[in-house]
Amino acid sequence: MRDRGFTLVELLVAMGIVTILATVAVPSYRHAMHRAQRLDARLALQRIQYLQERHYAQYLRYAARLGDNRDSPDSLAMPDRSEAGSYELSLLAGEDGQTFTATAQARVGSRQIDDLSCRQLAIDDAGLQRSADAAGNWSSADPQRCWG
């Protein structure tokens, strides 16, 4: 007559299978989460681009900074954080106000700080989309890697 329960070997085999599945699933889950959170940055940057074009139509120059003053020729009425709070937003305008670059950088303390391949996203007045990895290496060669 056989005792009810599991043998030690059966438990070790089951634990091994669970471990193998976890080593595959956890990185895939993190990658999917990082990719989903990038949408927060992309939407914020596209909103900045839209607001900059409206600002340019009104003042014939791009805004130089983000802020709360809606009627200032130097400020764009938008907060310096993305909606979900995962990214810090910044705006750099050319001295003549005819160019700009908007950047979203993963905020320290957010999950996105662990996004090693796409830690920063940027868009400029011409619509050029760029991204930077954790080391700060910028690239526009394959924008779909981080923007897609």
Where on the chain are the PLM-derived regions?
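N-terminal single-pass transmembrane signal-anchor helix
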Residues: 1-29
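Short, charged low-complexity linear motifs
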Residues: 9-19, 38-47, 133
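Detector for the N-terminal beta1/A-loop initiation region of ABC nucleotide-binding domains
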Residues: 14, 32, 107
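Alpha-helical interaction segments
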Residues: 18-20, 45-46, 52, 77, ...
